[in-house]
Amino acid sequence: MSLNNHHPELAPSPPHIIGPSWQKTVDGEWYLPEKTLGWGVLKWLSEYVNTPGGHDDPNRLATLIALSEAGLLDNENMFIPTDEQVRLVLWWYAVDDQGQYIYREGVIRRLKGWGKDPFTAALCLAELCGPVAFSHFDADGNPVGKPRSAAWITVAAVSQDQTKNTFSLFPVMISKKLKAEYGLDVNRFIIYSAAGGRIEAATSSPASMEGNRPTFVVQNETQWWGQGPDGKVNEGHAMAEVIEGNMTKVEGSRTLSICNAHIPGTETVAEKAWDEYQKVQAGDSVDTGMMYDALEAPADTPVSEIPPQKEDPEGFEKGIEKLREGLLIARGDSTWLPIDDIIKSILSTKNPITESRRKFLNQVNAAEDSWLSPQEWNRCQVDLAKYLDKHGREFAPLQRGDRITLGFDGSKSNDWTALVGCRVSDGLLFVIDIWDPQKYGGEVPREDVDAKVHSAFAHYDVVAFRADVKEFEAYVDQWGRTYKKKLKVNASPNNPVAFDMRGQQKRFAFDCERLEDAVLEGEVWHDGNPVLRQHVLNAKRHPTNYDAIAIRKVTKDSSKKIDAAVCAVLAFGARQDYLMSKKARSGRVVMVR
């Protein structure tokens, strides 16, 4: 699976934009696939599928008027996707040089009211009768589609009410032309085509789905697959497993999940998909062709942070305006959403803040025992405008000779090994390298780690270094002997580098709190490294006997690693030691005790 040689330079995407549909190039153009069946699918939709509503949408009316004036309007009820949905179709039907789909599964996560059901209903009709299967490349090298033989589309959900949302749209969206030309027999929960295809609902037991041979499966509202809104466990995971098994038997078969943001810790199908996507981004999982596309409100969109109107009228108005800006971003091109009504719902004390963020800001909230939330961490990713406003100078990328501190946490085989830096001048956290033992035959290459440490000292002005000694004691001792004259503060009493976590739990806990405070106050930055992000979000709060909160894994044997987060704490703590030392002010070495 590849996108051929189509590699324009991409503009950096802020953390609230996830996936391809809102990705732009450095030239400000939309990043689109070089080869896609999507253009043919879009043309087919405009000819055969009706809109389920939205006649008063200004953008839709403008499009209809333009088509009418050009003499191209055959059906005033025609389905007109938004620009955002057009890009989603183009990416979903992207193919490689052999005409194979780039993506074998997809997740579209959007806020409530975005139009997920009408959009997927349109795709279901295209999968039943439209040109969704690769036929050949034309003379210009563009892929040409054809209808899929034996099309079997399943709209799956864990409750019948969820499938009703989609199936109630089909009678309206199926045009007379579509019904006549393709011989559709439309029933309440199943639709047949004259060519032998079908669209069916599936909400029964997973066992009854065994052996099916679907060509396209919509997994509806997967944020409730596993645990429903009532808190009760359902058969969502079993359904997903059966669907995966059925899909794998049929060449070119794919699943598309639609969902709102999930509730962390419920272990739903939506949460598992999000976790898997993040593992792929962090290099911890193989990319098997998942298109994960989400559009969130920016991390600094306020809700609970908005002050009471009576106490601070000016602050209230500014907060509401900032909330509105966040909602306008999260809604994408769904201009029909009633933003003022949504704001009122968010402000109502009847509605939990976490639910408002999940439903309307499309944000994945942190679990209660999480160290930091995704929004809190995302707010600290380097943003050039915010950086300039805070520091009064432009952000400078890392360069040779920058003064930094280091944090190191090593493991021979059980956990990952990581080396993280923190720039002294602005608190920029960055990953120097990370080693997953599974990528090296089950054991971290300690010689490579050693070489990377020496390389860091050669490249940067390292003034402090904290390294946990466990499983790397000989190397840590050697680093201390080699660089003790260069380092300005000691990691622990009488040792320039060694920071034995087993005996330094109190200092580590307080540094966890200091870094947490720095993140919340915007006093630290990071470069958006996906591994560091994942490890930070994996970290759980761990109360200690020292009246301070440290971090740890969710369980000792959990596969959700936090090693890079530990290194970030060590590097940040080393920076704090250096800044508080006399050496940072006067040039004289002072040992920190």
Swiss-Prot record:
Similarity field: Belongs to the phage terminase family.
Protein name: Gene 13 protein
Domain of life: Viruses
